[in-house]
Amino acid sequence: MQKGKGAYDTGSYPNYLAEAGLHDEQVSRRIQEVFETIFFDPEQGFYHDVDEDSGCMEDTGNHDARTEGMSYGMMMCVQMDRQDLFDKLWCFSKRYMLLHEGRNAGYFAWSVQLDGKHNAEGPAPDGEEYFAMALFMADHRWGSRGRFDYLADGREILRHCIHQPELTGGGTMWNPENKLIKFVPDMEISDPSYHLPHFYELFAEEADEADRPFWREAAQASRAYIAQSAHPVTGLSPEYAAYDATPVLLFGKPWPWYSDAYRVMMNIALDTLWFGPRPEHETLAVNIQRYLATQLPEENYRACMLDGTRTEEPAMHPTAITATCAASVIAGRSEHAGMWLRRFAELPLRTGPRRYYDNCLYFFCLLMLGGQYRIW
């Protein structure tokens, strides 16, 4: 990668895992193996065919299908050039999750049962943003003249995200003043792990023309928010936070650094890979690599306060922590960077009922560290 530039400018996607002894052919083989496990392994996979023309990703810990997982699956498929599976996931999402009435029309129910019956009638914005990005990439990779008009579908999602009040009377997914993504449309708080400035840079090229300046501003606002919400010493980010980046505790959890928050490490890595290094991302990455190096091995990980104070609560997704911390090496290198890359290179997929979230993040980190998470 050229100094100061990312893959958007250079077209270069380095294999960071070569440093851990995995060369391009080995990485490609590992990526294919993990993809096959997620989608086709009868014991360890979590993709299911539902109808002849649709399928879903199961959250194996909660036995439901979530917009998070459905959109993750679509991103996996567009990266792996599997239009057949992509279309099955998008068909399920439109058929069973898309909301047609009321304030949330145009959004997607964040949780449904595996047969499509709704568990919720509200959305979670991390699903919508991944849906839109996967659809735009599908348009670029395969075109929009087949079963679905990917470009039109992606634009419609983003139109609802920022124009919902005039379309349905509902809440926006981004605050129109500060350009920060919300945790849910009707709560004026955020989730640092929802902030994907690298997606918003591309939304600014693909969304409705009139909305493109909004997305450019959102990218800059999110980069600032990610830095602001991270602890200045440990690099830990809260799961939920106010617009001033102070932690918000929800769902009876007294600790702020927990499952959602691990994605921040992965997100700054991909922003760096695509759009180049940033001092604030480097600082966060270096700090969190140093902190987490003191918490190993994986079975020792705990839910934490942002200053690093441990609680007695075990981390629910330890594989995801190691995977995303390794990915953060793309954004910044501490003295532990090589150790984290080697640890990830030797890390197996998670098994058991909580494998869905860990292995989704594992796959994305494998793609980006292996130089194969591309801008299509």
Task: Describe these PLM feature segments.
Residues 81-88, 121-127, 141-148:
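Alpha-helix boundary/capping segments in eukaryotic regulatory proteins
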Residues 73, 85-86, 147, 154, ...:
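Solenoid-repeat scaffolds in large eukaryotic assemblies
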